From Swiss-Prot:
GO terms for cellular component: cytoplasm. The gene is murC. It comes from Jannaschia sp. (strain CCS1). This is UDP-N-acetylmuramate--L-alanine ligase. It comes from the Bacteria. Keywords: ATP-binding, Cell cycle, Cell division, Cell shape, Cell wall biogenesis/degradation, Cytoplasm, Ligase, Nucleotide-binding, Peptidoglycan synthesis. The keyword RNA-binding does not apply. Pathway: Cell wall biogenesis; peptidoglycan biosynthesis. Belongs to the MurCDEF family. GO terms for molecular function: ATP binding; UDP-N-acetylmuramate-L-alanine ligase activity. GO terms for biological process: cell division; cell wall organization; peptidoglycan biosynthetic process; regulation of cell shape.
Length: 474
């Protein structure tokens, strides 16, 4: 057998990405470009991501049509691309290989030893933290992430080292195709159930994910989460390192407190009987400290020293749309966050409470009617850390409305669940009126969601700019 045939050939012809501007697709495209492959793709509109890919040498078409495939030899799609898409149909008609995003990612991973970061929540931040620590430790990893890493200005980078760090997306089950050497599991919650169907299937999916690691690999698991603790009990014939706040975790955070939104803590490496004292993470949130512990477990496994770990955590620059401060006007801080699942929303608002001396005003745009419907009671109860909650219209993401799962249904449900100040808002003008009416210096406005709410958050400081003048003259 020719061993070279088991790796991605260096000459594939033009690789066409349908939806090249997507956060999952663009990272793979960027790494392929950096490896010298001929890359092209299409998206429905231009964006900073597509413009960056063009600067790196990709050909990008705005709009999707069959003619875009001229010269293409391979077509890469995400799970969102279905029959009926003109480029998908044209590829089928021409007999071109159609490759799912995860399959192409898996081929890239075969070129390196790999760390795959899985879990319902925290994947993107944890991937960034692993990359940050390994970068600081001289490992120089290649990284493919599901969010823009502030330190890189991109969701991908090509390193010269032997390791690759990737975000493993469980949404369509294809993360089980990734050939991970080290697999991280942050948590397991019901999400993407349109694919998994049952919680038992979801559990099996994560068991398959960690079971794919080789005998010399490592599973890094958060045993603060009951589902992950159960998963650990099912892992056989593979090494496991646990992390969390609980007393049994191999990598444990202790003495945690917050100063001006900065997490201060020590890390107990219990199997080594070592305490890494005086660690700081320049962002609030117990969930972010937990994510950092996963990165520390990997860094320690790869030989990083305690001082290097401490320095890397202190210099962590974060990820776009993960508790990102987009402005401060008149003493009012505006935060943009991707959180769109009740567990994520609760964690982000708890972090906001830790970071703010004033009140917390939450603004949420529900993402998909199906998610709101299936987790309705959880959504009604996840805003308890916010003093004021405003709910925007549901971002449908192509779905049809579901009875009982609307903006107004959620507001009414929150009030029934005991929230004192929940209301509906219509648009950006309504948001501005709400903030002017409710917010005071020292308060924090947290905009949450996976849809267009990010644009609202980023535009809000300019809309409130006169408040700075009022504060200065007052």
């Amino acid at each position: 057998m020719n061993a070279a045939a088991t790796k991605l050939p260096t000459q594939l012809g033009s690789i066409h990405f349908v939806g090249i501007g997507g956060i999952g697709m663009s990272g793979i495209a960027e790494v392929l470009l950096n490896h010298g492959y001929d890359v092209q793709g299409s998206d429905l509109k231009a964006s900073p991501i597509t413009e960056r890919l063009e600067r790196l040498g990709a050909r990008v078409f705005v709009g999707q049509q069959a003619e875009n495939l001229e010269g293409a030899e391979v077509v890469v799609i995400s799970s969102a691309i279905k029959p009926g898409n003109p480029e998908y149909d044209a590829a089928r008609l021409r007999g071109l290989p159609i490759v799912r995003r995860a399959e192409m990612l898996a081929e890239l991973m075969r070129l390196r030893s790999n760390i795959a970061v899985g879990g319902t929540h925290g994947k993107t931040t944890t991937t960034t933290m692993v990359a940050t620590l390994l970068d600081h430790g001289g490992v120089d990893p290649t990284v493919i992430n599901g969010g823009i890493i502030h330190a890189y200005g991109s969701n991908a980078r090509v390193g010269q080292g032997d390791w690759m760090v990737v975000e493993a997306d469980e949404s369509d089950g294809t993360f089980n195709r990734l050939p991970a050497t080290i697999a991280i599991v942050t948590n397991i919650d019901p999400e993407h159930m349109e694919h998994w169907g049952t919680i038992e299937n979801l559990r099996q999916g994560f068991l398959d994910f960690v079971s794919n690691i080789p005998f010399y690999g490592l599973a890094v698991c958060c045993t603060d989460h009951p589902e992950v603790q159960t998963l650990v009990g099912k892992i056989t014939d593979r090494r496991v390192v646990t992390f969390g706040f609980n007393a049994q975790a191999d990598v444990r955070a202790v003495n945690l407190h917050y100063r001006a939104g900065v997490a201060c803590f020590d890390i107990a490496l219990q199997s080594e009987d070592i305490l890494i004292e005086g660690c700081t993470l320049p962002m609030p949130g117990d969930h972010n400290v937990s994510n950092a512990l996963a990165a520390v477990a990997v860094a320690r496994h790869l030989g990083m020293k305690a001082d290097e770990i401490r320095e890397a955590l202190d210099g962590f620059k974060g990820v776009n749309r993960r508790f990102t401060k987009v402005g401060e006007v008149g003493g009012i801080t505006v935060i943009d966050d991707y959180g769109h699942h009740p567990v994520e929303i609760a964690a982000v608002l708890k972090a906001a409470r830790q970071a703010s001396d004033g009140r917390v005003i939450a603004v949420h745009q529900p993402h998909r009617y199906s998610r709101l419907h299936s987790l309705f009671d959880d959504f009604c109860g996840c805003f308890s850390e916010a003093d004021v909650v405003a709910i925007a219209e549901v971002y449908a993401a192509g779905e049809d409305p579901i009875e009982g799962a609307s903006r107004d249904d959620l507001v009414a449900g929150m009030i029934r669940h005991g929230h004192r100040h929940a209301r509906a808002i219509l648009d950006e003008d309504d948001l501005e009126r709400l903030v002017r009416e409710q917010a005071r210096p020292g308060d924090m406005v947290v905009c949450l969601g996976a849809g267009t709410i990010s644009a609202w958050a980023n535009g809000l400081p300019a809309r409130l700019s006169d408040l700075d003048k009022t504060a200065a003259t007052g």
